Amino acid sequence: MSSSLQDNYIKKESLYGAQNYSPLSVVIEQGEGAYLWDVDGNKYLDMVSAYSAVSHGHSHPELIKTLQSQSTKLAITSRAFYTEPFATFLEKLSNISGFESVLTMNTGAEAVETSIKAARRWGYFSKGIPEDNAEIIVANGNFHGRTTTIVSFSSDSSYKDGFGPFTPGFKTADYCGSCHCGSIENCLSIESLSLIHISEPTRLGMISYAVFCLK
């Protein structure tokens, strides 16, 4: 439903922006709940109601109210200071998830990269794996982001072509929710001392990544 106005914005983005996405030919201007409006006033039903882990609807009134209230007091600060909202957030997230502590990240890719670091460090310091010998089991067909280390364990060549050399230390297993297929167990039977499993547990919803240490 492209118009001359939308075409102008699309051409401008194509001219000045990196061509790393292939969006629909619609220029969105406003959103409310599950609905979107383009610059020509056409209305759309957004079937995902925003994006990925923030699919709580567009311009949710309670979120807007909270954002406006907080921005009048403190819009941004570094972790060099303690803040009440962050402490309260950590407590609530810990209670909801059932985990003892929380480490927040800006993006999913950051969460995965940090999970890799946590898994390897646990392997070396707690499990006694020899230095530089840790291996992590990843699911075949995974998508965890586009950073160099993350695409290193992707099984999709379109994410890897032209970006090597890749980070070593990963073993791929077919994903099996019940683990009855034996894929992970087969990986463990190869070198059971040095394997750690990273996955994205669906039961946590908006909480990104967790590390599961296989004993």
Language model features: what each stretch is:
Residues K73, S178-C179, C213:
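Active-site/binding-pocket entry motifs
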Residues M1-E32, A80:
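Active-site-adjacent loop/helix segments that line or gate small-molecule/cofactor pockets in enzymes
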Residues D38, D46, E110-E113, H144, ...:
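Acidic active-site catalytic centers that drive phospho-/nucleotidyl reactions
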Residues I196-K215:
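Single conserved hydrophobic/aromatic residue that forms the stacking wall/gate
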Residues V26-M47:
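Active-site and channel-lining beta-strand-loop segments
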Residues L15, K43-I129:
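Glycine-rich loop-to-alpha-helix module at the N-terminal edge of alpha/beta enzyme cores
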Residues E91-L195:
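PLP-dependent aspartate aminotransferase-fold enzymes
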Residues S2, Q6, G33, H60, ...:
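Generic structural signal for well-ordered, non-membrane alpha-helical segments
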